[in-house]
Amino acid sequence: MTSRAIIPPGSGVPLAPYSPGMQADNVIYVSGTLPFDKDNNVVHLGDAACQTRHVLEIIKGVLEAAGSGMADVTFNHIFLTDWANYGAINAVYAEYFPGEKPARYCVQVGLVKPGALVEIATIAHKRA
């Protein structure tokens, strides 16, 4: 098995010792992605829809850096801080996955930085 870190151009420095993504053979794992700017500040405070879009754009960038894309996503792990934001998160999520939907789960949690409303981790496959 071969593996490599996926670090898109212009990525900020993570808050902890991890890579934004890892590719192992044809499987791509995207780390839990929060609505942070490159300086690890929470963006779009109080707006779950905008935070979700920001997170999914970061994930899209990691996948594209690995030669994959959103259509190749097979599983998403969604963490939200308040079930009241579930509808807003799903509305944006549906825009990024218009065809067959990836498997997923969604749980309510406390996130690592105040103001972050959503975090998503992703598994995708790279097309041969």
UniProtKB/Swiss-Prot annotation:
<comment type="function">
    <text>Involved in pyrimidine catabolism. Catalyzes the deamination of 3-aminoacrylate to malonic semialdehyde, a reaction that can also occur spontaneously. RutC may facilitate the reaction and modulate the metabolic fitness, rather than catalyzing essential functions.</text>
</comment>
<dbReference type="InterPro" id="IPR019898">
    <property type="entry name" value="RutC"/>
</dbReference>
<dbReference type="GO" id="GO:0006212">
    <property type="term" value="P:uracil catabolic process"/>
</dbReference>
<keyword id="KW-0378">Hydrolase</keyword>
<dbReference type="GO" id="GO:0019740">
    <property type="term" value="P:nitrogen utilization"/>
</dbReference>
<comment type="similarity">
    <text>Belongs to the RutC family.</text>
</comment>
<dbReference type="GO" id="GO:0019239">
    <property type="term" value="F:deaminase activity"/>
</dbReference>
<dbReference type="InterPro" id="IPR035959">
    <property type="entry name" value="RutC-like_sf"/>
</dbReference>
<protein>
    <recommendedName>
        <fullName>3-aminoacrylate deaminase RutC</fullName>
        <ecNumber>3.5.-.-</ecNumber>
    </recommendedName>
</protein>
<dbReference type="InterPro" id="IPR006175">
    <property type="entry name" value="YjgF/YER057c/UK114"/>
</dbReference>
<dbReference type="GO" id="GO:0005829">
    <property type="term" value="C:cytosol"/>
</dbReference>
<dbReference type="Pfam" id="PF01042">
    <property type="entry name" value="Ribonuc_L-PSP"/>
</dbReference>
